[in-house]
Amino acid sequence: MLRDRRHFIKLAVAALLGGAGIYSFLNNYRKNHVLDIVAYPDPALRRVSTPLERIDNGVIALATSMIDTLRYKAPVEFFLHASLYKGLSAPQVGIAKRLIVCGLNGETRAIVNPEILERRGTYDSQEYCMLLPCHRRRTIKRSSYLRVRCRGLDSRENSLEAIGSAAALLEHEIDHLNGVLYIDYT
């Protein structure tokens, strides 16, 4: 992932120095690396995703493209709508598999087949979703503590613990894997 970030920076610097400009660079990057986001109310968003049986090069490529998409969308949306996206699930790009990417503890990581093992407390989460740009932020009651079993792209089983906004982010993305959107909460 660090290699991808360095590659992105090198391309950006080359584009700026070459006179192409940042707009040209971002447009080229979007065409080559950014996945299309499924538009609400596409029925695919309501399907329950199936687990990934094995983590192969195709899954790793998908996760990398999802991370590229998240990195592209985050600053664009921040400047357009004052929103900062921190997570993306495979169903949001039209793939009904249990894969999410999100920024946790300053690191963007891929999480395969997440399963919530424990929830505690409540947390008032201010939520927004790139699938629903016409909807406003909502305050959603989420868990203040979450323990999740999952796999990484190296196929090893992991256990993640998250509190506060990180727990809310994980819960939001796992909801997408189960066909649930934040607008479903009252």
Locate predicted features:
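Positively charged
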Residues: L2-T186
